[in-house]
């Protein structure tokens, strides 16, 4: 893998993930709706306006129009730029310091970088989730915040809850991205090395990164989905005047309530769309990042 300065990795990582976000945001809208459907209700006791992936896409398009499938895109791009810029920058610093060469170093570096990125990007993810949940009453799931724009949402949250209100749900976001980042970066590096060792493809082919991203995406979805469901619930729940959540007290409380009231499988709600979103997003992000690093590395070598 090409070595580039951490500041360059910040730009490349943010750019790669923003590119991926444009393609995968419609899947994020569907996944968010499915994860909020039947919130804290026993299976079979609530209406289900969203049934599976294809039917859910159609339901969103009928209710909100085709552009409704790109709800929250601006906030999503802001989140991807902030979170992944910080994440790849911190991971690059760890690589530069040789920490990823130590046993378990890739996992630890990925987790720490993910935690920092999640904290910085949390306000954007909060707004993205609330915007994507919004729809007409006939197919509405979860609490409806009725924001009009990203700036309008920012102003409303700031006015009603203060600065700390922008970090509502961060307790679910940090572990979500920690496990996802650790799984993604560790398995991508290992998968790429394994594919190169098999010599099925030219060593510098973009197909190596594509194969590595495909393997990595499976690990990411398996470990991340329960935290993703919890994070969606924490971000979208209504809060009282003191900024406290009215449905959940935090990560553990949310997990326990989902388990008890909806059953353990509810922690994997929206798994199909989650893979259809996280899978391609992981594959495209890692592919774009790897290829952009190659280009930056070559440009750096030509300039010396």
Curated annotation (Swiss-Prot):
Indicate whether Membrane appears among the record's keywords.
yes
The record's keywords, sorted A to Z, are: Membrane, Mitochondrion, Mitochondrion inner membrane, Repeat, Transmembrane, Transmembrane helix, Transport
Quick check: keyword Transmembrane in the entry? yes
Coarse class of the protein's main subcellular location: mitochondrion
Task: Report the subcellular localization.
Answer: Mitochondrion inner membrane
Q: Name one Pfam family in it.
A: Mito_carr
Which is one Gene Ontology cellular component term of this protein?
mitochondrial inner membrane
Solcar repeat residue intervals = 4-97, 101-194, 204-295
Q: Name the domain of life.
A: Eukaryota
Please provide the Gene Ontology terms (biological process) for this protein.
blastocyst hatching
List the membrane topology term(s): Multi-pass membrane protein
SUPFAM superfamilies of this UniProt entry?
Mitochondrial carrier (SSF103506)
Catalytic activity reads: a dicarboxylate(in) + sulfate(out) = a dicarboxylate(out) + sulfate(in)
Q: Where are the transmembrane segments?
A: 7-27, 45-65, 98-120, 170-191, 206-226, 278-301
What family classification does the UniProt entry report for this protein? Belongs to the mitochondrial carrier (TC 2.A.29) family.
Function of the protein: Putative antiporter that exchanges dicarboxylates and sulfur oxoanions across the inner membrane of mitochondria.
Name assigned to this protein: Solute carrier family 25 member 34
């Amino acid at each position: 893998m090409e070595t580039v300065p951490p500041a360059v990795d910040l730009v490349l990582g943010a750019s790669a993930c923003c590119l991926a976000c444009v393609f995968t945001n419609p899947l994020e809208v569907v996944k968010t709706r499915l994860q909020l459907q039947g919130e804290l209700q026993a299976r079979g006791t609530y209406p289900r306006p969203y049934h599976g992936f294809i039917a859910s896409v159609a339901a969103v398009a009928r209710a909100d129009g085709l552009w409704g499938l790109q709800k929250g895109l601006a906030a999503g791009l802001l989140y991807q730029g902030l979170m992944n810029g910080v994440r790849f920058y911190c991971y690059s610093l760890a690589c530069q310091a040789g920490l990823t060469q130590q046993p378990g170093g890739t996992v630890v570096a990925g987790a720490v970088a993910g935690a920092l990125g999640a904290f910085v990007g949390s306000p954007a993810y909060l707004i993205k989730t609330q915007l994507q949940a919004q729809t007409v009453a006939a197919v509405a799931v979860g609490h409806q915040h009725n924001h009009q724009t990203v700036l309008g949402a920012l102003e409303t949250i700031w006015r009603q809850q203060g600065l700390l209100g922008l970090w509502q749900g961060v307790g679910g976001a940090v572990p979500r991205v920690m496990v996802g980042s650790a799984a993604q970066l560790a398995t991508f590096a290992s998968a790429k090395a394994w594919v190169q060792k098999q010599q099925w493809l030219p060593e510098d082919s973009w197909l190596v990164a594509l194969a590595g991203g495909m393997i990595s995406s499976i690990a990411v979805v398996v470990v991340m989905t329960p935290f993703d469901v919890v994070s969606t619930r924490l971000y979208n729940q209504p809060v009282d005047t003191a900024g406290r959540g009215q449905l959940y007290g935090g990560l553990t409380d949310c997990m326990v309530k989902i388990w008890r009231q909806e059953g353990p499988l509810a922690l994997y709600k929206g798994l199909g769309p989650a893979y259809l979103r996280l899978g391609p997003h992981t594959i495209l992000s890692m592919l774009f990042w790897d290829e952009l690093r190659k280009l930056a590395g070559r440009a750096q070598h030509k300039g010396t």
